[in-house]
Amino acid sequence: MIQTIRIGTLLRETVSSPYRNLVTRPTGAAIRNRIQAAIADSDCHTALLDFSDIELLDLSCADEVVAKLLLDGPDRGTRYVVLGGLREDQNEAIEHVLTTHRLAVAAMPGGEHPAPRLLGWVTADGRAAFAYLCERGTALASELAGGLDWPAARAEAALEGLAFHRLVHTDGDRYQLLPVG
């Protein structure tokens, strides 16, 4: 199951302001705390953070909300985070802070046929493996190796890197994209 957390709603409830700008570190920390509480109270395995009602996302809030939420990894247990409703300028802010922390997240663009996009620090092999999974939905390491003409160890390392960053789900052998719909 997927839990959708509307960041715009959290912002309005947290700062009691009509503005749709997510700026300042204290505001970002307050929003992150609300997200963490919502995730902790949910039985869902995937949280979709919906930024569609946010107009401005500055670097400090991208760091506080997204990077620090991902750094909180062990406390998330088996839960995953996916971003949605981002505009290009917001993608850039999040990409910058995640790359700095060597973190990554999957983002779902809007549109009729959205394909997930990786934001942050991911190796070239990881990006190629993610693109392969986007086309097929699921794969064994041996299938990825055959599909990309890679040695088995290279395919396994790329998929394990994606799983480590919680960008894909694995049952031990098969890797798949996170459910977001």
Regions found by a protein language model. Name each.
Residues 19-46, 51-103:
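Amphipathic alpha-helical interaction surfaces in cytosolic regulatory modules
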Residues 48, 135-148:
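Short acidic, hydrophobic short linear motifs in intrinsically disordered regions
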Residues 100-132, 157:
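Short alpha-helical segments that sit at the start of domains
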